[in-house]
């Protein structure tokens, strides 16, 4: 019996199984283009499902407000958003777990504070902007956090918050002029939270590695013990042969 070949086969199977486990733990991810989770009626938005590099067509499942959609491609294009397009979106690429939900809010407002996220990881980033209905020009825009003005812009330009800290958590809104009429957006809360996924990723890497190491050590010990046992048997057989002689 080729014990060496069997052991190598077992080791290969374990490594393959670990690879499958790691792949299976990967989730699909929903992203928006443009990135705003708050949009106005009539806006165009594309939801993108990222998960793998599969070239297979119709390999994506979309779920909107717990109902499976007829859309099967990785890109779901909403040409002119309506209130009915609001809600929870989940996607699943073939061979991957379902994504975390993304919530899209379609609103009817004269002035809207748009944001790329409502929850941001510590040291992450997010964007905000003051947007008017039908893309009318907004002038003399002032951005507020917790009712305190922190940014003035003559035009409605994007504001990017990079390396966000817990101090960036708060309630945001904006004011601006539409045709010489001052308008105010509703308030929107953004929370900066601690990133626990880094610790989880380390665990994902450590446990499979430990399993492989333990298997290799166990296999090595088995071979060592097996060889010692064979040597003892040979010595015993040799001793018996000499006695008979």
From Swiss-Prot:
GO terms for cellular component: cell surface; external side of plasma membrane; extracellular region; plasma membrane. GO terms for molecular function: high-affinity IgE receptor activity; IgE binding; IgE receptor activity. The keyword ATP-binding does not apply. Residues 24-204 are extracellular. Induction: Exhibits night/day variations with a 15-fold increased expression at night in the pineal gland. Up-regulation is due to a large degree to the release of norepinephrine from nerve terminals in the pineal gland and cAMP signaling pathway (at protein level). Residues 224-245 are cytoplasmic. SUPFAM superfamilies: Immunoglobulin. Residues 1-23 form the signal peptide. The keyword Iron-sulfur does not apply. It is found in: Cell membrane. Disulfide bonds join 49-91, 130-174. Coiled coil: none annotated. Expressed in leukocytes and pinealocytes at night (at protein level). Keywords: Cell membrane, Disulfide bond, Glycoprotein, IgE-binding protein, Immunoglobulin domain, Membrane, Receptor, Repeat, Secreted, Signal, Transmembrane, Transmembrane helix. Its main location: membrane. Tetramer of an alpha chain, a beta chain, and two disulfide linked gamma chains. Interacts with IGHE (via CH3 region). High-affinity receptor for immunoglobulin epsilon/IgE. Mediates IgE effector functions in myeloid cells. Upon IgE binding and antigen/allergen cross-linking initiates signaling pathways that lead to myeloid cell activation and differentiation. On mast cells, basophils and eosinophils stimulates the secretion of vasoactive amines, lipid mediators and cytokines that contribute to inflammatory response, tissue remodeling and cytotoxicity against microbes. This is High affinity immunoglobulin epsilon receptor subunit alpha. It comes from Rattus norvegicus (Rat).
């Amino acid at each position: 019996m080729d014990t060496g070949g069997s052991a190598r086969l077992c080791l290969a199977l374990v490594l393959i199984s670990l690879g499958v486990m790691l792949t299976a733990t990967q989730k699909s991810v929903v992203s928006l283009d443009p990135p705003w989770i708050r949009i106005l009626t009539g806006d165009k938005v594309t939801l993108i499902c990222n998960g793998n590099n599969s070239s297979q067509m119709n390999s994506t499942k979309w779920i909107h407000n717990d109902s499976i959609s007829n859309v099967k491609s990785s890109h779901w294009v909403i040409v002119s958003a309506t209130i009915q397009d609001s809600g929870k979106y989940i996607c699943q690429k073939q061979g991957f777990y379902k994504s975390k939900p993304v919530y899209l809010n379609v609103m009817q407002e004269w002035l809207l504070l748009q944001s790329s996220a409502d929850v941001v990881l510590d040291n992450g980033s997010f964007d905000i902007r003051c947007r008017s209905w039908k893309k009318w020009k907004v002038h003399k825009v002032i951005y507020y956090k917790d009712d305190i003005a922190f940014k003035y812009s003559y035009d409605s330009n994007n504001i990017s918050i990079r390396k966000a800290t817990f101090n960036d958590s708060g309630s945001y809104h904006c004011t601006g002029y539409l045709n010489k009429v001052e308008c105010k957006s509703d308030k929107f809360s953004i929370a900066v939270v601690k990133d626990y996924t880094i610790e989880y990723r380390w665990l994902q890497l450590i446990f499979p590695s430990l399993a492989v190491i333990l298997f290799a050590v166990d296999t090595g010990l088995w071979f060592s013990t097996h060889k010692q046992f064979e040597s003892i048997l040979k010595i015993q057989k040799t001793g018996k042969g000499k006695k008979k002689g």
